[in-house]
């Protein structure tokens, strides 16, 4: 049923042209956020000018004394907080150990994109210390982030259609992703929007595999089903290269393995069961590879002297293995998070951080509530409650994703810098569907949550552009 403020004609237009609706809503939201960024410059300089100095570069000399255009100002304001690390890594790879806390995915994509543009002669190769090169990387990072955000909304819309077969719910969920409380983090050179795109795409392929498994259509063969599953694992693995919490996307694979184990125990030689378990194993391994790959690269660089990158022959033997190299499961990511960023179980539970917990509480509650409701089968669209074999597999996918979402909230509250939950939650579809379901049903709580999302993203945008917390 259309909301009361919409005319039937407007409601029909939205449903007839869902992609146009998403595109126009996306453009309007981005213009709103960018206006906030530019408006923040009227208040004064950013609290920390690292982003602006990074983009100027030492080669520009008196660049700080020259007035910057709106475009340059926008780029500089968006290159704040962790974006500085991503842009720097895109320019010259990881140099300092603590930079390994930031996923290699975005720097790799930006670097590859710029190298491609250099190869075809669209842009010049960067100088040794050229400030313009860093502007190029920052701009490329912004373009990648915004493009990924748009595509992730479109993919989430398609995913909702495959899972729920409900256009209204799917469209509302995608629109909620557009106005995510992650706000400018999905517009700046950060990894969240790319993570969401890869995660939603992986879930879409996994859902298509669930549909193929239960279909009598000759085009939906077991081979096609298994290819969907493996491809989903590859995309989840790529998402993990962008953000380490992508490992939680392995939950559907684990649940599917458990679902097929009884059949394997009864008939260990059944070809279809063996093939299905093999596909799930390959897909799950691909998810894990997204985390293990960067860890292995770091181990070769820091723990094996002959492989140390960036050291000359005379310096190579002076490099001593780092403390984390001696661990039972050596992980540079775990070490730098603890050593440099003070990430660990209950380490963030201090009185000065209480305001950050209060800011994160609404999103934590939404994640836990929506996850628990989905695990219990509550607040699902009406059509989803008539479960056949195919829908049962999809509901298993939803519940495994909901469990991963709840685990993410628990980890954020106990181990992470809790305030990041508002942005990293953008890559999880269940809470979008849960909130969309409430809105479609006319639930006033859903409307209040949307109001919170818009207000939070607006205020956070002004603070981010001024290099002020929370980040």
UniProtKB/Swiss-Prot annotation:
Keyword Plastid recorded: no
EC number: 2.4.1.-
Disulfide bonds: none
Pfam families given in the database record: Mannosyl_trans2
GO molecular function: alpha-1,6-mannosyltransferase activity; glycolipid mannosyltransferase activity
BP GO terms, sorted: GPI anchor biosynthetic process
Transmembrane residue ranges: 23-43, 135-155, 169-189, 190-210, 227-247, 277-297, 348-368, 449-469
Coiled-coil region list: none
InterPro entries tied to this protein: PIG-V/Gpi18
Annotated compartments: Endoplasmic reticulum membrane
Pathway noted in the entry: Glycolipid biosynthesis; glycosylphosphatidylinositol-anchor biosynthesis
Function: Mannosyltransferase involved in glycosylphosphatidylinositol-anchor biosynthesis. Transfers the second mannose to the glycosylphosphatidylinositol during GPI precursor assembly.
Similarity field: Belongs to the PIGV family.
This protein's name: GPI mannosyltransferase 2
Organism expressing this protein natively: Chaetomium globosum (strain ATCC 6205 / CBS 148.51 / DSM 1962 / NBRC 6347 / NRRL 1970) (Soil fungus)
């Amino acid at each position: 049923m259309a909301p009361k403020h919409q005319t039937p004609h407007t409601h029909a237009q939205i449903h007839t042209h869902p992609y146009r609706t998403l595109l126009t809503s996306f453009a309007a939201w981005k213009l709103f956020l960018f206006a906030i960024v530019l408006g923040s410059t009227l208040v004064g300089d950013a609290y920390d000018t690292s982003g602006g100095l990074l983009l100027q570069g030492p080669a520009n000399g008196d660049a700080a004394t020259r007035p910057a255009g709106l475009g340059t100002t926008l780029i500089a304001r968006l290159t704040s907080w962790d974006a500085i690390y991503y842009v720097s890594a895109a320019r010259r790879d990881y140099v300092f150990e603590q930079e390994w806390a930031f996923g290699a995915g975005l720097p790799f994509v930006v670097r590859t994109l710029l190298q491609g543009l250099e190869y075809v002669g669209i842009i010049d190769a960067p100088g040794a210390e050229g400030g313009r090169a860093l502007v190029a990387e920052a701009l490329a990072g912004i373009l990648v982030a915004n493009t990924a955000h748009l595509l992730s909304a479109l993919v989430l819309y398609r995913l909702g259609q495959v899972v729920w077969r409900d256009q209204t719910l799917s469209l509302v969920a995608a629109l909620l992703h557009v106005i995510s409380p992650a706000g400018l983090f999905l517009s700046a050179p950060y990894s969240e929007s790319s993570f969401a795109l890869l995660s939603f795409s992986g879930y879409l392929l996994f859902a298509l595999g669930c549909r193929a498994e239960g279909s009598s259509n000759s085009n939906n063969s077991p081979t096609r089903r298994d290819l969907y599953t493996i491809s989903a694992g590859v995309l989840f693995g790529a998402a993990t290269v962008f953000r380490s919490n992508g490992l939680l996307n392995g939950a559907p694979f684990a649940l599917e393995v458990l679902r097929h184990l009884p059949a394997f125990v009864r008939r260990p030689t059944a070809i279809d069961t063996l093939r299905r378990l093999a596909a799930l194993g390959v897909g799950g391994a691909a998810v894990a590879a997204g985390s293990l790959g960067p860890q292995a690269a770091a181990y070769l660089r820091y723990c094996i002297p002959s492989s140390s990158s960036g050291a000359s022959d005379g310096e190579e033997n002076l490099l001593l293995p780092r403390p984390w190299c001696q661990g039972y499961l050596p992980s540079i990511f775990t070490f730098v998070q603890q050593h440099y960023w003070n990430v660990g179980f209950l380490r963030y539970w201090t009185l000065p951080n209480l305001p950050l917990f209060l800011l994160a509480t609404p999103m934590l509650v939404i994640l836990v509530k929506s996850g628990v409701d989905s695990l219990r089968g509550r607040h699902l669209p009406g059509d989803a409650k008539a479960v056949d074999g195919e829908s049962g597999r999809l509901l298993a996918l939803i519940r495994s994703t909901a469990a991963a979402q709840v685990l993410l909230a628990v980890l954020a509250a106990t181990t992470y810098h809790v305030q990041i939950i508002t942005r990293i939650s953008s890559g999880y579809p269940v809470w979008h569907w849960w909130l969309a379901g409430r809105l479609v049903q006319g639930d006033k709580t859903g409307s209040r949550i949307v109001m919170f999302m818009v207000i939070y993203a607006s205020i956070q945008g002004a603070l981010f552009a001024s290099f002020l917390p929370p980040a």
